[in-house]
């Protein structure tokens, strides 16, 4: 695994010439209940990308995008949102810049609120024939700061999880919550900011989820490379999106 932040520009040029793929973790800075840190989405995105890089030496991890579209978490202290338009513009410009060096650029997104601006950014970059695609974890389960995210955080940073503060939030299915979330945000349905129940989370479950996501990312990159080779041109577009990529908050 290579971190872009640790490399010099000549080293990066050599990596790009060897066919390396740049993977950009895309997270958010937002509340994750009383038990998880506000950088949870960043931490998870970076962990998945670095785990994937351990299996593919040609994956280069970029510094994470730390801010995104988190307006649904307004009203909770610590949430720092730049909105959808700014997120889209940021990703477009990052994609353009990264494609000047790398033959393939992947945006690995762990925050559902970024899904719409990322899709629009990918559409824009694709229309410019830039070799980019987006990826989301294929995780089912609860929506925000619940069992899934808590388990992954217990696997990657247990010292930062306050399990003594973990409690169920709104556990209704997404079909019952979506209209309320769109109109009033998370605060309108969950006083503690949780959508789901984190109390059953475990590090073992988190490691299983992390390993599966990393393997899926490696596979998605391999398929994209193959597509580029088979078409003989720069393939672009959205790839490997989970069922809840536009819903998880």
Predicted regions, residues:
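Extended, histidine- and acidic-residue-enriched regions that form the cofactor-binding/catalytic faces
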Residues: 1-106, 110-233, 238, 242-249
């Amino acid at each position: 695994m290579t971190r872009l932040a640790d490399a010099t520009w000549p080293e990066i040029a050599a990596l790009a010439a060897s066919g390396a793929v740049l993977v950009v973790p895309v997270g958010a800075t937002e509340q994750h209940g009383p038990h998880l840190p506000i950088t949870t989405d960043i931490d998870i995105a970076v962990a998945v990308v670095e785990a994937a890089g351990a299996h593919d030496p040609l994956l280069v991890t970029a510094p994470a995008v730390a801010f995104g579209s988190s307006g649904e978490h307004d009203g909770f202290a610590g949430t720092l949102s730049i909105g959808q338009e700014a997120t889209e513009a940021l990703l477009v410009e990052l994609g353009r810049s990264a494609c000047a060096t790398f033959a393939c650029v992947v945006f690995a997104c762990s925050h559902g609120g970024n899904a719409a601006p990322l899709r629009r950014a990918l559409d824009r970059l694709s229309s410019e024939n830039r070799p980019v695609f987006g990826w989301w974890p294929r995780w089912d389960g609860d929506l925000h700061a619940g069992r899934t995210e808590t388990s992954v955080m217990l696997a990657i940073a247990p010292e930062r999880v306050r399990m003594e503060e973990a409690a169920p939030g709104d556990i209704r299915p997404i079909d019952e919550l979506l209209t309320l979330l769109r109109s009033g945000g998370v605060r309108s349905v969950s006083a503690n900011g949780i959508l789901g129940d984190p109390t059953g989370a475990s590090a073992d479950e988190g490691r299983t989820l992390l390993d599966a996501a990393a393997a899926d990312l490696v596979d998605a990159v391999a398929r994209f490379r193959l597509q580029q080779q088979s078409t003989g041109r720069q393939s672009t577009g959205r790839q490997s999106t989970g069922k809840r990529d536009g819903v998880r908050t």
